[in-house]
């Protein structure tokens, strides 16, 4: 009997040790263009409308990163950085016109080789056939909100319903399948919402009808002292279209006029045509009376801008409501399946977004609203609930973090840093003191010039190198980045010091893609294609 007892003791101890070392599941719940200031837990200017109660609960259960940034504020490149753990110039995907090289080393391949059951559902935006996944179904390109097509290993399929719901349905089935297999899983649940054009679920079409969305303080920014900002094409005033972006004045039969119309108008028709007659009936019933009132009002000037902002912001936030609800659905599934306690849940988005800030929509710039991206992580038993982190982190860190969480080997050529020490409350002494940024997509949509730059905990230096223009901001005294201090003689030594830091980062990351300043003739030609505002053309500062 004693012999049997001594034989069983090490077996029990081994079982307990194995249980402790059980690999955690990882859920990466990812959205498109969700600005941190459109999440209640970030305490931004939209908090009063309570846009994300479920994401806020996730933050209460885990850690919220207040200084989370992207390396290149545009959809495809941001996703490529996350997959590869390398800056755009290293992974080869610098703008949305590129195609991702799936043959390269990416973290899902490493996790799969380590025994993880892996899946990718929703928006990939990297082109090509996803690799490193046991299961996948992705939207072609940007994808559609209603009855979207999905690319799968079996071919192209039309999926009836609303995209955010559909992608979450796939994720839920994968979780149940993984449990049955008894394997740890890594799930990338990647939503189209709230990307342009903003089409909410039918159940949310009347959400916010009874309130006015607060306006950002910079809605009527005049871009003084910021020359590049004067030459963009992303203003709510001049570049947000009533048809394409706001879905007004669509003909009852959805017939496209024979006379050619701008592509921005056709897109609205194409989106609406995906709806079933039943879906379209509900949509028209919700928006018809509002559109009629808008036409009768005949708004102009600032009144028109304010109306467009309200329609845009409400549809944007309505799209986010679908994301918020589906996050709750997936978390409930984890609870119901008994998996929540061993599942790391990560919420993020590919970059930030302008929700009327500086009078804009879209992203791309190194200014705070598009540079910042949300990052919230729940890790039961590891992260202190309700904690907030102010260290400088980037999407460059995600690949290493996921590998570290799983106990997998981290390749030496990845360029980020694992966030696991920060999640455990142990900041390394050598943690970065600045982040590096580089945007490439020019000339292109919205006409945001190429630029690179550095951001420290207080200062930001931006180099619009093809135009030979620099900007410098003190984020402590000027958080809205309205005053360019680059030419201020009192800041000369400080700027030179930070410029040296920028060069050091650029060289350290091996970025040799910064181009020389272009000839004046080229600069003039490029900016002649944009609707330049002169001082006299700025909207007057009137109430």
Give the residues covered by each predicted segment.
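Formylglycine-dependent sulfatase
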Residues: 15-465, 469-470, 479-500, 504-507, ...
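Bacterial Sec-dependent N-terminal signal peptides
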Residues: 1-22
């Amino acid at each position: 009997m004693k012999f049997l007892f001594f034989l069983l003791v090490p077996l029990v101890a081994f079982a307990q040790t194995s249980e402790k070392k059980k690999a955690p599941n990882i859920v990466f719940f990812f959205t498109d263009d969700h600005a941190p200031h459109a999440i209640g837990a970030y305490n931004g200017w939209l908090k009063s409308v309570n846009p994300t109660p479920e994401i806020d609960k996730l933050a209460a259960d885990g850690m919220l990163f207040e200084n989370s940034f992207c390396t290149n504020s545009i959809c495809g490149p941001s996703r490529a950085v996350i997959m590869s753990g390398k800056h755009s110039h290293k992974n080869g995907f610098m703008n949305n016109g590129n195609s991702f090289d799936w043959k390269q080393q990416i973290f899902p391949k490493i996790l799969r080789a380590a025994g993880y059951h892996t899946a990718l559902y929703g928006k990939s935006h990297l082109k090509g056939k996803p690799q490193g996944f046991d299961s996948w179904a992705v939207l072609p390109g940007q994808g559609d909100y209603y009855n979207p097509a999905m690319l799968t290993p079996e071919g192209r399929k039309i999926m009836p319903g609303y995209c955010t719901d559909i992608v979450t349905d796939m994720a839920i089935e994968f979780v149940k399948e993984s449990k049955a297999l008894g394997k740890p899983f890594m799930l990338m649940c990647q939503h189209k919402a709230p990307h342009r054009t903003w089409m909410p679920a039918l159940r949310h079409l009347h959400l916010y009808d009874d309130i006015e969305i607060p306006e950002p303080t910079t809605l009527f920014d005049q871009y003084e002292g910021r020359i590049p900002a004067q030459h963009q094409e992303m203003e709510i005033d001049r570049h947000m279209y009533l048809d394409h972006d706001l879905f007004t004045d669509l003909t009852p039969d959805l017939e496209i006029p024979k006379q050619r119309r701008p592509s921005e108008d056709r897109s609205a028709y194409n989106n609406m045509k995906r709806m079933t007659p039943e879906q379209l009936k509900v949509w028209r019933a919700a928006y018809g009376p509002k559109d009629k009132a808008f036409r009768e009002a005949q708004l102009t000037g600032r009144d028109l801008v304010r109306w467009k902002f309200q329609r845009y912001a409400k549809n944007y936030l309505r799209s986010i409501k679908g994301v918020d609800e589906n996050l709750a659905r997936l978390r409930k599934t984890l609870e119901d399946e008994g998996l929540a306690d061993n599942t790391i849940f990560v919420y993020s988005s590919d970059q930030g977004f302008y929700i009327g800030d500086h009078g804009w929509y879209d992203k791309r710039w190194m200014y705070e609203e598009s540079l910042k991206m949300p990052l919230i992580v729940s890790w039961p038993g590891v992260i202190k609930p309700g904690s907030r982190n102010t260290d400088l982190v980037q999407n460059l860190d995600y690949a290493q973090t996921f590998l570290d969480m799983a106990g997998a080997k981290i390749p030496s050529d990845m360029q980020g840093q694992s966030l696991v020490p920060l999640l455990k409350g142990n900041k390394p002494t050598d943690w970065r003191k600045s982040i590096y940024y580089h945007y490439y997509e020019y000339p292109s949509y919205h006409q945001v010039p190429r630029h690179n730059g550095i951001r420290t905990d207080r200062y930001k230096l931006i180099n619009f190198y093809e135009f030979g223009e620099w900007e410098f901001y003190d984020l402590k005294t000027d958080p809205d980045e309205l005053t360019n201090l680059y030419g201020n003689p009192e800041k000369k030594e400080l700027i030179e010091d930070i410029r040296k830091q920028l060069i050091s980062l650029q060289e350290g990351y091996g970025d040799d893609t910064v181009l020389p300043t272009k000839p004046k003739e080229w600069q003039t030609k490029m900016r002649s294609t944009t609707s330049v505002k002169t001082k006299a053309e700025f909207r007057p500062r009137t109430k």
